[in-house]
Amino acid sequence: MWNSLKAFALVFGGCCSNVITFETLMSNETGSINNLITFCQFLFVTCQGLPEFLDVHQPFPYFKPLKTPLHVYVITVVLFYISSTTNNNVFKYNISIPIHIVFRCFGTVITMFTCWLLNGRKYTKIQILSTLFLTIGAIIASLFKDADFRYQDLKLQAWKIGSDQSVDLTFIFGICILVLSSFTSSLLSAYNERTYQKYGKHWKENIFYSHFLSLPLFLFSRKQLIHEYRVMRKSERILCSNFGGKILVPREETLLLFNVLTQYFCVKGVNILASKTNALTLSITLLVRKFISLLLSVRLFDNNLSYTGYIGVYLVFFGAFIYSLGSIHPRQNDKGAIKKSK
């Protein structure tokens, strides 16, 4: 029980804080540093977990025996790397934050489908209904965050799309990346669920090796990483107080440090939760977390949320509520699915 509460605290605290620091870094005037952010997040998690999985008491240091086979982590690494890098780099292709949220909201539906297809999991009518409420609410709140829904505006937008002959290929490419990111993220959730069922819930090992084995893949983007590091070094200095007075520190590097720390807590919470629950519960928890972040953004950055947007938020929380009610009863289908996967 305590581990579950700890996981929820890490997810909602760490992930929400991480989104705030990430969006602040995204709004910098020096340029995009998305690849550098992702690399630093992976490197920090690897360094933090290294002492636990590296045995240094022998003449030659070596990694402790794996509890989960290496070939399982190879698939995890591929899915995790693709999901993380595409998710952080999609903003380069004319994708706005609302569009990003809308597509990521479909992750819950995709997760339900992949778990049904790959793991043989069956869901109750209440769970399916709650997922629909969550997804529809997420889309409404994202699309109508700033302005209320009006039928005339919808007709005008449809007319513009129909009459516009030019095609924004950059935007289309960005949408394709978003679709890829959503599918790989859902596949990763379903794959982790099966891994935990078959080999045990070794979430710490999963965190370490999914990040550690992903680091060599960043060699393919090493030139971009060097460029982004130089861009970050050009950021303005801000005045910070310390015990001896005040010092000037790089603004971007300070934000990056907080982003990396909060990402670690976020990843830790997500993996603990993944080991305690199923993939759909995890997906719904992350969806609700996104809307906590949305409400924090409205509050902290003086952004307005329309009445239509609030309707979407209410639908999200209502969907989460009825899903929790549907999850109280024992899941006989889940037990059958576990036996089937073995």
Swiss-Prot record:
Pfam families reported in the protein's UniProt record: UAA
Gene Ontology, cellular component aspect: endoplasmic reticulum; endoplasmic reticulum membrane; Golgi membrane
Superkingdom of source: Eukaryota
Top-level taxonomy: Eukaryota, Fungi, Dikarya, Ascomycota, Saccharomycotina
Intervals, Lumenal compartment: 28-35, 83-96, 145-168, 275-307
InterPro entries attached to this UniProt entry: SCL35B1-4/HUT1 (IPR013657)
Family label: Belongs to the nucleotide-sugar transporter family. SLC35B subfamily.
Cytoplasmic compartment spans: 1-6, 57-61, 118-123, 190-253, 329-342
GO biological process terms on file: chitin biosynthetic process; transmembrane transport; UDP-glucose transmembrane transport; UDP-N-acetylglucosamine transmembrane transport
Positions of transmembrane segments: 7-27, 36-56, 62-82, 97-117, 124-144, 169-189, 254-274, 308-328
Function text: Sugar transporter that specifically mediates the transport of UDP-N-acetylglucosamine (UDP-GlcNAc) and is required for cell wall chitin synthesis.
Protein name in the entry: UDP-N-acetylglucosamine transporter YEA4
Main subcellular localisation: endoplasmic reticulum
UniProt-annotated location(s): Endoplasmic reticulum; Endoplasmic reticulum membrane
Membrane topology value: Multi-pass membrane protein
Species, as recorded: Saccharomyces cerevisiae (strain ATCC 204508 / S288c)
